[in-house]
Amino acid sequence: DCLLSRGLGDVYKRQVLASAKEDWIIVAGHHPIYAYTPKEESERLDMQKRVDSILRKHNVDMYICGHIHNFQHIRVPGSDIDYVVNSAASLARKVEPIEGTKFCSPEPGFSVCSIDKKELNLRMIDKKGNVLYTVTRKK
């Protein structure tokens, strides 16, 4: 089973995550919590303060977002969460590694997730259909 919550208020997120019994807990949002971006740092700091603490408390496996139009996989020291930024199929922006970056690419594309009880794979795929990188988690 996979729990996917989108755009929910903080109180509702806490309630949903506290009752989650799924094998994998994946949260999808629009804005990144950790990512390289030329956009305002305050945007990410707010997400780290308001959202990341909730995700960590409830043992979320992966946080997936978009907003900045490039591929990024980040593992922040002290967190077991995989933070993933998904590219856009038609527009991509430059990207540079930050602390915790496992992979980043400015290629336009999309991601595909495959999940079973023991393994989660998120494949980052470019516009030609080539797998650029795979985020793998095992239970």
Q: Where are the model-predicted features located?
A:
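Short amphipathic alpha-helices and their capping/turn segments at secondary-structure boundaries
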Residues: 13-20
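Alpha-helix capping/helix-boundary segments
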Residues: 33, 69-70
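Binuclear metal-dependent phosphoesterase catalytic core
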Residues: 72, 76-139
